[in-house]
Amino acid sequence: MIWKRHLSLEELNATSSSTLVAHLGIVYTRLGDDTLEAEMPVDNRTHQPFGLLHGGASAALAETLGSMAGYLMTRDGQCVVGTELNATHHRAVSQGRVRGVCQPLHLGRQSQSWEIVVFDEQGRRCCTCRLSTMVLG
């Protein structure tokens, strides 16, 4: 397991109350040895005007996962901030839920890079994101 902080899924989800994460319905669902996963509903909160999953909602899911994964890689007195997010949208989703899977690409002392892949309920890749973060403190 790569994580330096050890939080349960309940504790991870509790950090999101009264935030954009909670408003979008994002819920952390799995903490693996080197992966963090979350789900987000595809509904009126996350749709764009034409009834499809908004690209910004996919980006919010990705940044949420990458930032929390980055935080789990820090020690007391440190925090993580996003510095760049890239998202490539592959497939439209109109309903159901999407699942984001976050894995590290680079874990340095001051910078991190994360890949977040968003899948639909059929397991098809809908969006691929890369988040760069900076470790502060």
From Swiss-Prot:
Offer one Pfam family short name for this entry.
4HBT
Identify the Gene3D superfamilies for this entry.
Hotdog Thioesterase (3.10.129.10)
Q: Does the keyword Transmembrane apply?
A: no
Q: Pathway involvement?
A: Siderophore biosynthesis; enterobactin biosynthesis
Q: What is the similarity comment for this entry? A: Belongs to the thioesterase PaaI family.
Subunit organization: Homotetramer. Dimer of dimers. Interacts specifically with the aryl carrier protein (ArCP) domain of EntB.
NCBIfam families membership: PRK10254.1, unchar_dom_1
Q: What is this protein called?
A: Proofreading thioesterase EntH
Q: Which organism is it from?
A: Enterobacter lignolyticus (strain SCF1)
The taxonomy runs:
Bacteria, Pseudomonadati, Pseudomonadota, Gammaproteobacteria, Enterobacterales
Encoding gene per record: entH
